[in-house]
Design a protein with these regions (language model features):
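Short, conserved phosphate-binding/catalytic loop or strand-edge motifs used
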Residues: 134-144
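Short acidic/polar active-site loop segments enriched in Thr and Asp
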Residues: 40, 127, 221-222, 290, ...
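Second-shell residues forming the walls of enzyme active-site clefts
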Residues: 8, 20, 26, 47-70, ...
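Alpha-helical scaffold segments that flank or form the walls of functional sites
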Residues: 104-126, 208, 217, 280-286
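Catalytic domains of carbohydrate-active enzymes, especially glycoside hydrolases
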Residues: 32-45, 115-128
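Preference for extracellular/luminal or secreted protein segments
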Residues: 1-37, 275-525
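A charged helix-plus-loop insertion that forms the helical arch/lid used to bind
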Residues: 92-105, 149-151
């Protein structure tokens, strides 16, 4: 691998950028990024992946091109958090998400899910997982974190997140704590707006920073930034990603972090809309971010590289700091390549372990006095199809629905797919149809945000029919339901979850999960 002393200015700058592309094969404009601008790192999404063999071939191709053009192996990165943020297709082994794992009550499960994920990714040639999420989901109205977090207390997030870090590293894959210094206590999605968390340093140390400190102590080699304003830390109205006070002053100097700092995508609206992606990339580099992501648009990555080159040549970007950052990247890549991975077992063992954890995550937030209602002879299964509730999720619908999958399992009753935000007319029609059924099984998907789902739930509950309500993403949908409604947290909208849920619905299995949310626990009592 090329040394720092052997690298040109353009090659150094290329080490500090990661870029993505559309489609299953890299287009010409993306290859131009590598060949002309020496971009040395890649991010993959579901849009780039058809199946395991195709992903393995793609990673090998990309690695070969980058090594030939830059003399340095690339980091090939991916967001494989588990649950609602998974980039591998359904045919591969996907783990439950963070909050589901925490609901099992066993931190060892977080370690095993990290080890399993690393084994899976490494087998395809992906060497850097952009996980775990170390945000504390202390705001129930948070539209982007939710079940991606391990819970709403710093202690739980620190414990489970640190175990995930250890599992990923033992499995031979680099990982990154995100989103520093915290994205949990906001009701704004930074993909779409510019959130603000108005806390002092001491307040952050008491809550938001605790999981990050624990993750760093567990050996996390990278930390991802967040595009959020922290006005008591950075008064210049710039988000953490672009703030030298936060990236260098707080993370490097006060917390003593010596690994690589990486950005969230600079095409998110918190940057693109308010500051501009190209300007934001340079500001992040100057703030102390080692690896900056332009994940969607190769043309923007070209502009960012051209702008960074001009800044390096005119003295705006400090060349000594550039060298320190690039050397840090080279050492990280050498360390990653030298990892000696452990394994959890063969594919069948990994799949079985993931399903064991998923089944253990299903949580009864409330059961009626008589226990789980019986489905009876003619159950009504209903709920909306999944939808992209945040840009962090995958870009396409799953192609299956909760009602239809449950009806298939039951082999009786009716499946009814509702709108994601049903209006009064649809609610009235659904309630009239429900009267003929023995039991109502309703699946919601962030109904606490799209309130029509909860209006439907309460209207159905008012019929007095036996009813089971299943939250298929954030469990806040389960608040304030009548006592006769059984309320279950399923955490995700996936076929493996539906398969694990069916024995609970038909009475042959008991939900054993424990709610990892103090706020919802209090509300449920």
């Amino acid at each position: 691998m090329r040394t720092l002393q052997e690298m040109t200015l353009q090659e150094k700058l290329g080490q500090r950028l990661a870029a993505g592309f559309q489609g299953l094969e890299p287009p010409k404009e993306f290859l131009r990024l590598i060949k002309e601008y020496k971009v040395g790192n890649i991010i993959l999404f579901r849009r780039n992946i058809q199946d395991g063999p195709q992903l393995k071939k793609l990673c090998a191709t990309l690695r070969k091109v980058v090594e030939e053009e830059t003399g340095v192996t690339p980091f090939i990165t991916i967001d494989q958090e588990g649950g609602v943020v998974t980039r591998l297709p359904e045919s591969e082994v996907n783990i439950p998400g963070a909050m589901a794992v925490a609901a099992t009550g066993n931190p060892r499960n977080a370690y095993d899910m990290g080890l399993l994920t690393a084994q899976e990714l490494r087998s395809y040639g992906v060497d850097f997982n952009l996980a775990p999420v170390m945000d504390i989901n202390c705001n129930p109205d948070n539209p982007v974190i939710g079940v991606r977090s391990y819970g709403d207390t710093p202690e739980r997030v620190a414990e489970y997140g640190s175990q995930m870090v250890r599992g990923l590293l033992d499995g031979g894959v680099y990982c990154s704590l995100k989103h520093f210094p915290g994205h949990g206590d906001t009701a704004v999605d930074s993909h779409l707006g510019l959130p603000c968390i108005d806390r002092s340093f001491d307040e952050l140390m008491q809550r938001e920073l605790k999981p990050f400190i624990a993750g760093i102590e567990a050996g996390a080699p990278a930390v991802m930034t967040t595009h959020i304003l922290f006005p008591q830390i950075e008064p210049e109205h710039i988000p953490a990603t672009m703030s030298r006070r936060i990236m260098t002053g707080l993370l490097r100097e006060k917390l003593g972090f010596g690994g690589i700092i990486i950005s969230d995508c600079m095409e998110m609206d918190a940057i693109k809309k308010f500051y501009g992606t190209v300007n934001g990339v340079l500001a992040a580099m100057k703030a102390g971010v080692d690896l900056v992501f332009v994940s969607q648009t190769p043309a923007l990555a070209v502009e960012a590289m051209q702008n960074a080159r001009r800044a390096a040549e005119n003295g705006e970007l400090d060349l000594a700091e550039l060298d320190v950052s690039v050397q840090r990247m080279l050492e990280a890549k050498a360390q990653c390549a030298a990892m000696q991975p452990k394994t959890l077992g063969d594919e069948a063992a990994c799949r079985a372990r993931a399903e064991e954890v998923r089944a253990a995550s299903i949580t009864a937030v409330h059961l009626p006095q008589g226990g789980m209602p019986a489905l009876g002879d003619n159950p009504l299964f209903l709920g909306c199809a999944d939808y992209r509730s945040t840009i962090a999720s995958n870009g396409e619908s799953s192609g299956f629905t909760f009602p239809e999958e449950m009806r298939r399992h039951a082999d009786k009753g009716t499946a009814l797919v509702t709108d994601k935000d049903p209006g009064d007319a649809e609610i009235a029609e659904v309630v009239s149809q429900a009267a003929a059924h023995s039991c109502i099984v309703l699946g919601t998907y962030n109904g606490h945000i799209l309130q029509g789902q909860l209006r439907l739930a309460k209207a159905l509950a008012a019929t007095g029919l036996p009813m089971i309500l299943v939250a298929l993403r954030n469990p806040y949908d389960l608040r304030n339901m009548p006592n006769h409604v059984a309320a279950l947290a399923g955490w995700e909208y996936t076929r493996p979850l539906f398969d694990a849920l069916w024995p609970v619905l038909n009475g042959t299995a008991r939900p054993t999960g424990k709610l990892p949310l103090l706020t919802l626990t209090k509300a449920a009592k």
